[in-house]
A protein has these predicted regions:
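Bacterial Sec-dependent N-terminal signal peptides
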Residues: 1-28
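N-terminal amphipathic/hydrophobic interface segments
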Residues: 24-537
Length: 537
């Protein structure tokens, strides 16, 4: 077909030469309704400087137009420098300054056009641009269907929309929807973010990006997002199919993640996993709310926080877990429980975090377990503060009090302080318990294992005496200013009473061991998490 048209062009050029040779003749021709078809697909010649009619054979005649050519087909207008219309082939071809105006908003420009009149399909090449008043598409060649308002390029293309530039090897432009489907080596550059993917849907009117393939997004802050499905628009986004967000040392993965940069908030839903490599923690939860600019996170839906250690990781669960950057100032607040703290608003240390856990708090590690109603932990002092009916277990030993502070060092238990109504109970046999109670207790750990404990203030004990054969010989029921308790492999080994001591050593036959209980005795074994699985029940 192209060979045929080049022959026609050659003939037409000869004819044009004869036209140009006529001096003093008015060349501009105003033509209102000359057409090469008589149906709804007819092409009307609106104007041209020169028009030549040429009959090639009995079945073929062509019209050659040159100079300011204007054509119309339906709502589409065509402009060019020269054009050849072929009524038998139902096509026309145009050269130089080619322009198609499709309705009020679409304009296509190129150096060359081959147009199938009956199918309303335009094949353009040579510096092709398509504009919809919102964005400009540039490509070496373009197929544009005026019936469907769909443009297709397969030799690479670029779209510029304000400050956003998109490139791909293939593209499909849907004019009525103002959407472009970019395919194969898609790249988006914007001052606020960059996108790399294999497939992308982009709306030129709303500047919305829709992801339908594996996609990587890197924003101006360095935050990296990996997703397979979702959308991104003006700082608002929603991602599906387990996207991942990497923000500094924090990696967040969930079934669905949404964020709004204007408010600095994000939300992750469904099997959420948050890994903080700087802090050595992993958070697993059903739902996560995050204040990104403040690095605050609120986890609900059976959250599990893991403090990773080389040998003995610590697992923490609660109804709700909150974590944030640690403020510098910590001051007393007497309106709260004794020994609790209030965090003042001040300049923050971006390397330290704190954790708050609320309701049904459980802790599990191989060396110790604990439960309480609420908990506070800070990287600043590495102390776990357990509030409201706390219980801590270390092997056979149960420790209770109004408040318990567990000090850690190098991610291992180091010290222990129990405030008010302190008590330690060690089960030595069925229904037989060694017990020490006091106002306050302080303990020490060696290599993460409970080594010793000192009881202060109104200290009292019930201790079962055994001979070398482990036969029970008596019961020591005493009071003292101080009581020191020593452990061997975390089992209670001996008790030493210091200061003023009063009490009685009862022969084992005179007392019922099951009745030997201190006033605050309560065995909480049913509350104790026995494994990591117990934390999730």
């Amino acid at each position: 077909m192209r060979t045929y048209f080049y022959r026609v062009i050659f003939i037409s050029c000869l004819l044009l030469v004869s036209v140009f040779s006529l001096e003093g003749q008015e060349n501009r021709i105003a033509i209102d309704s000359i057409s090469i078809q008589q149906d709804s697909n007819k092409v009307e010649i609106l104007g041209s400087d020169r028009l030549t009619l040429l009959k090639v054979d009995d079945t073929t005649s062509i019209q050659i137009l040159a100079g300011r050519v204007r054509l119309r087909q339906g709502k589409a207008l065509f402009n060019c420098d020269s054009c050849v219309l072929n009524n038998s082939e139902n096509i026309f071809e145009a050269w130089r300054n080619v322009q198609i105006k499709d309705g009020d908003s679409i304009q296509v420009n190129a150096r060359h056009l081959l147009y199938k009149i009956d199918k309303k399909i335009a094949y353009l090449d040579g510096g092709v641009t398509l504009s919809d008043r919102k964005a400009i598409l540039s490509t070496p060649s373009l197929e544009y269907n005026l019936n469907t308002d769909i443009g297709i390029y397969t030799n690479g293309g670029k779209v510029v929309n304000k400050k956003t530039t998109l490139t791909s090897k293939e593209g499909y432009y849907y004019a009525s929807l103002k959407e472009i489907y970019f395919k194969n080596d898609v790249k988006l550059n914007d001052p606020g973010y960059k996108i790399t993917t294999d497939s992308l849907l982009y709306n030129t009117a709303t500047q919305t990006n829709r992801f339908i393939a594996k996609t990587t997004i890197i924003d101006s802050s360095g935050r990296r997002i990996e997703t397979k499905d979702g959308y991104y628009k003006g700082g608002k986004a929603e991602f599906n199919q387990r996207p991942t967000i990497i923000d500094g040392s924090t990696t967040i993965t969930g079934d669905r993640i949404a964020f709004d940069d204007s408010t600095g908030t994000s939300q992750a839903i469904g099997n959420v996993v948050v890994v903080d490599t700087a802090q050595g923690t992993t958070l697993v939860t059903g739902q996560l709310f995050r204040q990104d600019n403040e690095e605050r996170m609120l986890a609900t839906g059976k959250p599990l926080l893991i403090f990773k250690q080389e040998k003995d990781s610590l697992y923490l669960t609660a109804d709700t877990i909150f974590t944030a950057i640690q403020p510098n100032a910590v001051e007393k607040d007497t309106s709260l429980l004794k020994n609790t703290t209030r965090i003042s608003v001040s300049k923050k240390d971006s390397t330290l975090r704190y954790v708050e856990a609320f309701h049904h708090v459980k802790i599990f590690s191989d060396s110790l377990q604990a439960v309480c109603d609420s908990l506070y932990y800070s990287d600043k002092d590495s102390i776990f503060r357990l509030f409201r009916d706390p219980v801590l277990w270390s092997k056979e030993n149960q420790i209770t009090g109004d408040t318990i502070w567990l000090y850690t060092k190098n991610k291992k238990s180091d010290r222990l302080t129990v405030f008010e109504n302190s008590m330690i109970i060690s089960q030595v046999d069925t229904g037989i318990y060694n017990q020490v109670g006091s106002i306050r207790m302080e303990g020490r750990f060696t290599d993460g294992n409970l080594d010793s404990l000192r009881a202060f203030g109104n200290a009292e004990t019930i201790y079962f005496l055994q001979d070398e054969d482990s036969t029970y010989t008596g019961i020591n029921e005493s009071k003292s200013d101080l009581i020191d308790i020593y452990f061997s492999i975390q089992a209670l080994e001996r008790i030493v009473l210091r200061g003023a001591v009063s009490g009685t050593v009862w022969p084992i036959q005179q007392k019922n061991p099951a009745e030997m209980k201190l006033p605050l005795f309560k065995w909480n074994d049913l509350r104790r998490p026995k494994s990591r699985l117990d934390l999730l029940q």
